[in-house]
Amino acid sequence: MTKPFRIANAPCSWGVLEFDLEGEAAGYAQVLDEIAATGYSGTELGDWGFMPTDPPALRAELDRRGLALLAAFVPVALADRAAHAAGEAVALRTARLLRDTAGQGCFIVLADNNGSVPQRTQNAGRVTAEMGLSDAGWEVFAEGANRIARAVRAQTGLRTVFHHHCAGYVETPAEVARLMALTDPEVLGLVLDTGHIMFGGGDPLALLRAHQERIWHVHFKDFDPAVAAQARAESWDYFGAIRHGIFCELGRGAVDFPAVRDALTGMGYDGWIVVEQDVLPSLGAPKESAQRNRDYLRGIGL
């Protein structure tokens, strides 16, 4: 019998995002309470300082609610070589917290500094090749990703996964493929994010087929093509698309989650599935959405 997937959620579903945005997100105690209350068994860390940064204190908060700690998102401006050293330091600090709280099974979720390049942010979901990195730019980007992943592995034993993400330099299937070709498969894997790859013009199943050996971590996020079409027509930037609900509740968009479930099962994936429904701070009803998302997954056998 196939081992059932473990299902987690993340603070970003409560508006705890890496961007400097207006609005007040919920505090960590409320977020953890509501993740547990809505039927999830794990969480990602959220921004540094959102949850306690003392390992025993963080472990106590998680244990009190029966939650596992899985990963932490670390954005770095990888296209800028001058940012690599500071990015490595942040990744190592974060990796040590993960390791000392929850052991060696956690991941650093490395990403571009999404939302920081105006052209990519303004054209999220509709970027053209001309908006991408040059060959030299790709070498710098991959150099930074390899450097950080190798340092994390060598100094903490943790593995790193790269998160393709709209409003960054790795958004489209071609950009994902380019990064994977340029990076070390021994230390850097890939997050499959079902919503971001669709927003970026791709297909989750095709991404799974293309990069099966590199997919070590999975984010379940739905995608509303009607909002994407409106974003194109009205030239919304990435944050405008988020505000209008581009990442809708699971089962209400275009992602074929039963097919993704079957593909993950077929490839022998044994990691976590993390539900993420990115919302802006103070918007939406996160607990109710989390419950509906969990109910949807139960309805498809997850």
Regions found by a protein language model. Name each.
Residues A83-L190:
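Active-site acidic/histidine proton-transfer and metal-coordination neighborhood
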Residues E18-A25, W138, P173, M198-Y269, ...:
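Gly/Pro-rich active-site loop or hairpin
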Residues M1-D20, P75, S116-T128, S235-H244:
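N-terminal small/glycine-rich loop or linker at the start of catalytic domains
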